[in-house]
UniProtKB/Swiss-Prot annotation:
Source organism (scientific name): Novosphingobium aromaticivorans (strain ATCC 700278 / DSM 12444 / CCUG 56034 / CIP 105152 / NBRC 16084 / F199)
Entry protein name: Ribosomal RNA small subunit methyltransferase A
Enzyme Commission code(s) on record: 2.1.1.182
NCBIfam families for this protein: ksgA
Signal sequence segment: none
Gene Ontology molecular-function annotations: 16S rRNA (adenine(1518)-N(6)/adenine(1519)-N(6))-dimethyltransferase activity; RNA binding
HAMAP family assigned: 16SrRNA_methyltr_A (MF_00607)
């Protein structure tokens, strides 16, 4: 195993500090980082996309697990530290300077890949929903292992009838299986955020037949955009939606948070042309 200096020493030597503008919070606990890297299963020889590696804490753990990592980092300050990691693990790490929201992962890999990332808080949900919303399914990614604020993680795995249940839960669960792999105390980060965090692990599931992902997005956007209103109000602007409720025997006086993921899929199926 490659001997590496302590991560804190690397951060101090390169004068790195987490910036709020980039949504950064660094993890230094190597045991925790190794545990996160084990969540996707065996990664030896597997392609892994990491977004926002910062000084390379999780990157180290992924490399130690034998992964072939492609890391996208927009903070120029972190590039020298990542270059040192690339030298320590020849042929295993590729670093791309850029904005992950503007880079299509499909252009980076010849085959399937995993995503493992302590996502910057300010773009985490945007990236996550982007990975979930592809029209082609199953996707080219094999799994997503992502750090989120605990509140967001709970929204991803939420069940109908709960306060956390909403559009994010439906989009995450209708053709994938998300779970909270572990919770992470705020004290594990430098600087400590104001909230707790959690690791979400997602694997693709079978695609329901006859349903357009785009239509499901439209249905959930309308329904949860006015979540306190009855469906007859929130969905009235979506052509055919009220007829779909009648066909399915769904009471239009119900509210969006009472419908199951399967209910939303059924509505979208009837509206898919």
């Amino acid at each position: 195993m490659t001997d590496l200096p302590p991560l804190r020493d690397v951060v101090n030597r390169h004068g790195l500090y987490a910036t709020k503008a980039l949504g950064q919070n660094f993890l230094f606990d190597e045991q925790l980082l190794d545990r996160i890297a084990r969540v996707p299963g065996k990664l030896k020889g597997e392609n892994v996309l990491e977004v926002g590696p910062g000084p390379g804490g999780l990157t180290r753990a992924l490399l130690r697990a034998g992964a072939k990592v492609t890391a996208i980092e927009m903070d120029k300050r972190c590039l020298p530290a990542l270059a040192e990691l690339a030298d320590a693990f020849p042929g295993q790490l590729t670093v791309i300077e850029g904005d992950a929201t503007k880079i299509a992962p499909e252009t980076l890999f010849d085959g399937p890949w995993h995503v493992a990332a302590n996502l910057p808080y300010n773009v985490g949900t945007q990236l996550f929903t982007g990975w979930l919303s592809g029209q082609d399914w199953p996707p080219q990614w094999k799994s997503l292992t992502l750090m989120f604020q605990l509140e967001v993680a709970e929204r991803i795995v939420a069940q109908p009838g709960t306060d956390a249940y909403g559009r994010l839960a439906v989009l995450a669960q209708w053709r994938a299986t998300p779970r909270i792999a572990t919770r992470v105390h705020r004290s594990a980060f430098t600087p400590p955020p104001k909230v707790m965090s959690a690791i979400i692990h997602v694997e693709p599931a079978a695609m329901p037949e006859g349903v357009s992902a785009r239509m499901l997005e439209r249905v959930t956007e309308a329904a949860f955009g006015q979540r306190r209103k009855m469906l007859r109000q929130s969905l009235k602007g979506l052509p055919g939606a009220l007829d779909a409720l009648e066909t399915l025997g769904i009471d239009p006086q119900r509210r969006a948070e009472t419908l199951s993921v399967e209910d939303f899929v059924a509505i979208a199926r009837l509206l898919t042309k």
